[in-house]
Amino acid sequence: MLESTALFSATTIHLDRLMCAFNCMTPFGQRDDVLITIDRDGLTFIRQNNHAAEIQLFLAKELFQYYSIREGFEGEIQLCMKLNHLLDTVSVANRDKDDVVECTLSYDGEGTPFMLILEDSMITEQVEYATYLVGEMDRTGLELDRARLEFECILKGDVLYSALRDLREIGCKECYLYIVTSSRARPMFALVSRGQLGLSKIILPSERSVLEKLEVYENDSTTLIHDAPVIGLFDFAALDKLRPSTKIASKVLIRKDVHGLLAVNILSDTNAILVPEKRELIRASRSVSAEYPTVVIEVFLLEKASVGDIDVRDVHQLMLTSPAHRRSGFADSGSRIVSVTPTATSAAHTGAGSLLGLAPPSAFPAEETQDPDESYHPAPSNTDIPLFL
């Protein structure tokens, strides 16, 4: 029997989940190579795009009804193959909505093909793909510095998807992330577009049901600060690669470090949100219904090499004219801007505001005009537990 003899084999009936997951990787190069790593927790698919962006797709073993690695094998299994080969096969097999198709993934080690076996009530098909090995992937500059974060937030995936779609429709060329918190009012997360129409902004809803958590740090991942906007500049063509992933997301975790690296963690169709580096906790989430298998996507994007002072001033002035900004009572302190290169980091604080003189942050009361049930209570900060709650 194939399942008992191959080095690795796994069987699932969730072809629609596989197809959606693989589709999220296509903006990063549909016909390019993808590095596959297999261990006892699941499969990881990694694809880099010009060393300025990277996507990691993790399929947990809970996605499969049968999952096996040969007894006695230690370590990880690695191979490379073309992403479009997998996507084409899964797409064709998933067209028949009236019959259950069972898909088996199988690999017997270096020098053997990666196989997909598709079986329904009428026929069994076997597809073999050529595989090869490459050297270690260079991840220099694409690893998040979790000890030196500028901000992190958790928000609903469909809201971010709608915002990215709207920015695309108005011809956005460059996108600024504008993040600010206050001890007296709700936080603000905005996307500012620069394109042929000039500057325009999309302010995401600040209700707790949408923006679950938003914290700004003093470049150390622990010290909370308020009334000091963080502005980051990204090429929209790169940022828009997130859109297929956010379309299937339940919640999205966004973090940015002082080196200008933006990390976006996405999990599809489940409330058991996990950060990929916490994979050991997946074992504790096996109570998740089989109808919602665990699919985790992590995307890394590098900020543009420099942010002009004039551009940042324009963005800051645009946000100061926002009615939401005026109602919230944010202090007009200087923005925090980080100019980065792939190998060097420099942080510059502009404006008259002093970050070091701020009082320790405290939870702020609900606004008088808000229903008590909608009051905002920032989630506790604890880097030792999964950030998704």
UniProtKB/Swiss-Prot annotation:
UniProt keyword annotation of DNA damage present: yes
Kindly list any coiled-coil regions of this protein: none
Q: Does the keyword Membrane apply?
A: no
Q: Which InterPro entries match?
A: Rad17, Rad1_Rec1_Rad17
Q: Identify the domain of life.
A: Eukaryota
Which Pfam families does this one have? Rad1
Q: Name one GO biological process term.
A: DNA repair
Q: Which UniProt keywords apply?
A: DNA damage, DNA repair, DNA-binding, Hydrolase, Nuclease, Nucleus
GO MF annotations, alphabetized: damaged DNA binding; double-stranded DNA binding; nuclease activity
Task: Point to the regions of Polar residues compositional bias.
Answer: 380-389
Q: Where is this region: Disordered?
A: 358-389
From the Swiss-Prot or TrEMBL record, state where the protein is found.
Nucleus
What does the UniProt function comment say about this protein?
Component of the checkpoint clamp complex involved in the surveillance mechanism that allows the DNA repair pathways to act to restore the integrity of the DNA prior to DNA synthesis or separation of the replicated chromosomes.
- Similarity comment: family membership: Belongs to the rad1 family.
What protein is this chain from? DNA damage checkpoint control protein RAD17
Upper lineage ranks?
A: Eukaryota, Fungi, Dikarya, Ascomycota, Saccharomycotina
